[in-house]
Regions:
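Extended interfacial segments that mediate partner engagement and assembly in macromolecular machines
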Residues: 106-107, 123-163
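Iron-sulfur cluster-binding cysteine motifs and their immediate structural context
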Residues: 67-89, 95, 99-117, 327-344, ...
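Ferredoxin-type iron-sulfur electron-transfer modules and their immediate structural context
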Residues: 1-75, 130-138, 218-225, 233-323, ...
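N-terminal secretory signal peptides
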Residues: 1-2, 172, 178-226, 407, ...
């Protein structure tokens, strides 16, 4: 059923028309006089690209010569990444495409624009306030992005964990990628990385990602409830009236900022839960939770039913072959491996990123990588458990009170029948 058009919608449409009439010939005048408004943003693809910084500490190739990982060098379109003597060097001829950031399993390459949480928040802002949000690259868009368009240097810059969280929380997100736009692009691995990341995320989330290939199909329509809330907030600022008195439905809509803040709070609470439960090894080393894993764990915490769809790599331990040399513990970039006092190797699945370095450095071949589902990645939510417990107690109290009232009512009716006789 279509949403009923009311007085507030009419007022919003009128206000849009008034705003457009304030300076109707401004653009024509500027064009004739050659005036350039410096305050307005200008299209420059370089503004959406940045050279990644490098952290050699978690790099698998830097930690051990036995590592077979060279994912960053494999995806680099101009071969500017060099790893030698435990150090990573990015040459000045870097294209700033960001593919190395997405390819690195340990997040040794850092780009503030491409951090999984920042990408998620950018998509959340666009998808929460608009009917459809789009993720695209500078080569495809070739203009300043609108409010519902999230622009990255290359479409392959978004990881599978980020896509998984986006697909689960926002079904109204699509990728804009014109046909053959990647054919002549120098970022040769970008389209392939996008396909692999989205295909895995779609399997995990159990739903498909939208795709747009025509520029004319890109729409920028705000969701009705958020447009109304935006208008009501403007009235509050100008008149001081309470929004709930004007329209309670609008007051109940959570703002974009509030939704992002709630997600950040969930991620922080999840990290605190893990830190208190298993955040430190027996050698007093603090385990490291990558940003991509944070997003995945947060999504699985809210949607545990999706855990069976998730496929991840975990090391499997053979106690008979292990000599307790500790090589795997020293090599693990996130300190997920731990040698316990009883002579047993323990691997914390929530921190393990499945890089396989522990299996590669084990000279006794006591470790091998196997594929499992994500059931071990579901972290209990203490707040949700507390609320569920309170709800169960309230339900039990209600049932008890209902039974007591029913019993008293039955006795009263019996007394009335006796008096009638």
């Amino acid at each position: 059923m279509a949403e009923q058009h009311d007085m507030f919608d009419d007022i919003i449409e009128i206000s849009k028309g008034v705003d457009a009439l304030k300076n109707p010939f401004g653009g024509i005048t500027d064009a004739l006089l050659g005036t350039v408004d410096e305050s307005k943003p200008h299209w420059n693809p370089a503004d959406y690209k940045e050279r990644p910084r490098v952290n050699c500490i978690p790099c698998l190739a830097c930690k051990s010569e036995k590592s077979s990982c060279h994912a960053c060098m494999d995806v680099c379109p101009v071969s500017v990444i060099e790893i030698e003597d435990g150090a990573i060097d990015v040459l000045d001829s870097c294209r700033k495409c960001g593919l190395c950031v997405a390819a690195c399993p340990t997040e040794a390459f850092v780009s503030p624009r491409l951090q999984p949480k920042k990408v998620y928040d950018a998509v959340a802002r666009a998808a929460t306030a608009h009917e459809t949000a789009y993720v695209t690259c500078t080569r495809a868009l070739k203009r300043i992005p609108r409010e519902n368009e999230v622009l990255v240097a290359c479409v392959g810059d978004v990881t599978r964990e980020t896509w998984f969280s986006i697909l689960t929380d926002f079904p109204n997100v699509s990728v804009y990628l014109p046909l053959d736009i990647c054919a002549n692009c120098r970022n040769t691995c970008g389209e392939e990385m996008l396909g692999e990341a989205i295909s895995e995320a779609e399997e995990w989330a159990g739903r498909g990602m939208g795709l747009e290939v025509e520029p004319r199909d890109l729409k920028c329509n705000k969701r009705r409830e958020y447009e109304r809330k935006e208008f009501m907030d403007k009235i509050v600022r100008q008149t001081g009236l309470t929004v709930s008195k004007l329209t309670p439905a609008t007051a109940a809509v959570a703002s974009v900022t509030q939704r992002i803040r709630e997600h950040s709070s969930r991620v922080s609470a999840l990290e605190k839960t893990l830190n208190s439960a298993c955040g430190v090894t027996t050698q007093k080393r603090r385990r490291i939770l990558t940003q991509g894993r944070q997003l995945m764990l947060s999504t699985l915490q809210q949607h545990p039913e999706l855990a069976e769809n998730v496929r991840v790599q975990f090391p499997e331990f053979d106690h008979d072959r292990c000599t307790m040399c500790g090589a795997c513990v020293e090599a693990c970039p996130t300190f997920a491996c731990d040698l316990l006092d009883g002579g047993k190797l323990a691997i914390e699945p929530t921190y393990c990123i499945g890089c396989g370095l522990c299996a590669e450095v084990c000279s006794d071949h006591a470790l091998k990588m196997v594929e499992r589902d994500g059931s071990e990645l579901v972290v209990p939510d203490p707040e949700a458990e507390r609320k569920a417990k309170l709800a169960a107690e309230a339900k039990a109290e209600y049932a008890e009170a209902k039974a007591e009232v029913k019993q008293k009512l039955g006795r009263a009716l019996d007394q009335i029948e006796k008096l009638a006789d």
